[in-house]
C-alpha cells in the first residue's frame, strides 16, 4: 500500500509538470493545488480565485481538506502549492502570508442544552461536560491554555477530524463539540453555537515551501492573494 501511494504521488507530480511545461508563455493556464482545514476563511481564497478567474479563466483549483499535519505533509511532498493553516509556522521551512481574518472558537451544542441559555461559554462551564474536540495536537494545546487545565483532566468523550461528523455526535447527545464558528449551519436545526469567553481566536496563514518554484498559474494566484490580503488590511484600518 505504501509503494502504491508513493507511485500515485509521483504520477501526480509528473502530470502536473507536463501541464506546466505545455502552458503557453502568453496564456496563463493550469492547476493550483490547495490544502486546508475546515474553516470559513476558505472564502478568502474563493474571492481571490474568483477575481483572478476574470483575467485567467483557464486556471483550475483543486482543494483538499485535512488537518495541519496532512497539509504540511502534502506541502513537503510537493502535492499541493499552498496550505491554509492556523498553527504556528516554521519559518525555516515555509514562507507565508498572514491573512486579515480570524476564526472564532466556540461550542456546538443542542438547543435543549442548559448551556444554550448562555450567550457565551466559560472554561468552568465545560470542566465537567462531555467534550468532543479536534484530534489535532496543536488544537489540543491551544484549547488547554484556554481551559487552564491539562486536556487529560477533562472529560473528552470523542475526537473528530471533520466537524460535520462531530455535529452528528452532538445532535445525538454525545457531548459538546469545540470548533470554529460558521462551519455548521445551525439555522432551523436542533443545534446552536456559542462563542467562548474569554474570546479565543485563531489567525489564518497561507503557507508554501521556501524557495518554491511555482507554475505560472500558482504564481499568478499567489500574486492575487497578496493583493487581496493587502486590500483587506487597508479596509480594516480605514
Model-derived regions: residue spans:
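Alpha-helical "hinge/linker" immediately C-terminal to small N-terminal DNA-binding modules
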Residues: 1-29, 230
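Flexible hinge/capping segments at coil-to-helix
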Residues: 25, 94-105, 109-131
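A late-sequence structural motif
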Residues: 44, 193-235
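Hydrophobic hinge/microswitch elements
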Residues: 67-80, 85-86, 136-192
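Secondary-structure junction motif
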Residues: 116, 129-151, 214-223, 229-236
Amino acid at each position: 500500500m505504501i509503494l502504491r501511494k508513493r507511485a500515485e504521488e509521483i504520477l501526480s507530480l509528473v502530470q502536473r509538470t507536463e501541464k506546466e511545461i505545455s502552458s503557453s508563455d502568453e496564456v496563463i493556464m493550469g492547476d493550483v493545488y490547495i490544502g486546508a482545514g475546515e474553516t470559513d476563511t476558505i472564502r478568502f481564497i474563493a474571492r481571490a480565485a474568483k477575481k483572478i478567474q476574470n483575467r485567467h479563466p483557464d486556471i483550475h483549483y483543486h482543494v483538499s481538506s485535512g488537518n495541519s499535519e496532512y497539509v504540511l505533509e502534502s506541502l513537503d511532498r510537493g502535492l499541493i502549492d499552498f496550505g491554509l493553516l492556523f498553527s504556528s509556522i516554521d519559518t525555516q521551512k515555509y514562507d507565508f502570508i498572514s491573512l486579515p481574518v480570524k476564526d472564532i472558537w466556540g461550542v456546538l451544542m443542542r438547543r435543549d442544552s442548559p448551556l444554550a441559555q448562555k450567550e457565551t461559554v466559560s472554561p468552568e462551564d465545560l470542566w465537567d461536560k462531555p467534550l468532543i474536540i479536534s484530534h489535532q495536537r496543536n488544537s489540543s494545546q491551544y484549547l488547554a491554555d484556554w481551559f487552564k487545565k491539562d486536556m487529560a483532566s477533562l472529560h473528552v468523550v470523542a475526537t473528530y477530524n471533520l466537524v460535520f461528523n462531530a455535529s452528528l455526535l452532538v445532535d445525538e447527545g454525545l457531548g459538546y463539540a469545540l470548533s470554529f464558528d460558521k462551519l455548521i449551519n445551525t439555522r432551523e436545526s436542533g443545534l446552536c453555537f456559542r462563542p467562548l469567553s474569554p474570546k479565543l481566536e485563531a489567525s489564518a496563514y497561507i503557507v508554501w515551501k521556501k524557495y518554491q518554484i511555482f507554475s505560472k498559474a500558482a504564481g499568478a494566484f499567489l500574486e492575487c492573494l497578496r493583493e487581496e490580503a493587502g486590500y483587506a488590511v487597508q479596509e480594516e484600518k480605514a
